[in-house]
């Protein structure tokens, strides 16, 4: 069905938008089944050629808000609806022709389903985890597997920064591996579908102060944590006292601290 849609509507991937179309119908079905859809508020980000949209509609959500910047794709969607490829009856169905980083969800406790290109992964995660007023309940995101590896394995300092700002807000697990052969055109890298389940464990920790601490702590990743903090205009004696209070070794490296300790450090250091 997915390949038929591409052929019927003469859809071509745009390199400028980093488009790779998932054409394995079984995987599309699996993605649509990761979280509960029926009578829920769903936001689909960058639907592109609407194969997943069709599956979501079949599961009868309460509302389905699509966020798509590509005008050509929106025109194709309208054609598919006009041709009765699928019906949107009894669904609060909206198309938002807007940059996703400017999109502000109105509903509460919604789920996000998204297909995110590599270059905008971090900005989109930050937008929905930190910037929007109404946060999602969970997010199902198809992304390049090397991004998932960075979040999971933290093999470079930039990966630690990404992982920490995610861990503060949610638990992450790999829901599905997607081989590159399932896309048209096939990308160079395999993909994964990740499930982000938001929690409120650290909601009492100020987001702005936490992110500021992380930025300062990782400003020179080859240095010890204490040196980075002192070089960021924190008083050395204050830092040592805080480390002692939290039972942190004075010469600890940033990769040795877990998210709970980072949150404690953020709270105390900014008193």
Segments predicted by a language model, with ranges:
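Catalytic cores of RNA-modifying enzymes
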Residues: 1-212, 216, 244, 255, ...
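C-terminal lobe and adjacent flexible extensions of AdoMet/dcAdoMet transferase-like proteins
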Residues: 198, 216-271
């Amino acid at each position: 069905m997915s390949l038929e849609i591409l052929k019927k509507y003469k859809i071509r991937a745009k390199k400028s938008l980093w488009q790779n179309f998932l054409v394995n119908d079984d995987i599309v079905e699996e993605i649509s089944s990761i979280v509960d859809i029926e009578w829920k508020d769903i936001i689909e980000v960058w639907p592109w050629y609407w194969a997943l949209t069709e599956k979501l509609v079949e599961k009868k959500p309460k509302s389905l808000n699509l966020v798509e910047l590509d005008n050509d794709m929106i025109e194709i969607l309208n054609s598919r609806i006009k041709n009765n490829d699928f019906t949107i009856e009894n669904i609060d169905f909206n198309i938002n022709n807007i940059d996703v980083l400017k999109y502000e969800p109105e509903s509460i406790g919604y789920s996000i389903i998204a297909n995110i290109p590599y270059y905008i992964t971090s900005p989109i995660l930050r937008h929905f985890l930190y910037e929007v007023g109404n946060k999602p309940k969970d997010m199902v995101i198809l992304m390049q597997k090397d991004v998932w590896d960075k979040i999971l394995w933290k093999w470079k300092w930039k990966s630690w920064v990404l992982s920490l700002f995610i861990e503060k807000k949610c638990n992450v697990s790999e829901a599905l591996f997607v081989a590159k052969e399932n896309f048209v055109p096939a990308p160079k890298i395999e993909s994964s579908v990740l499930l982000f389940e938001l929690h409120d464990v650290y909601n009492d920790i100020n987001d702005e102060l936490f992110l500021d601490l992380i930025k300062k702590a990782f400003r020179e990743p080859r240095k010890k944590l204490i040196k980075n903090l002192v070089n960021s205009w924190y008083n050395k004696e204050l830092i040592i006292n805080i480390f002692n209070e939290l039972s942190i070794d004075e010469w600890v490296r940033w990769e040795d601290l877990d998210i709970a300790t980072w949150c404690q450090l953020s709270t105390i250091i900014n008193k």
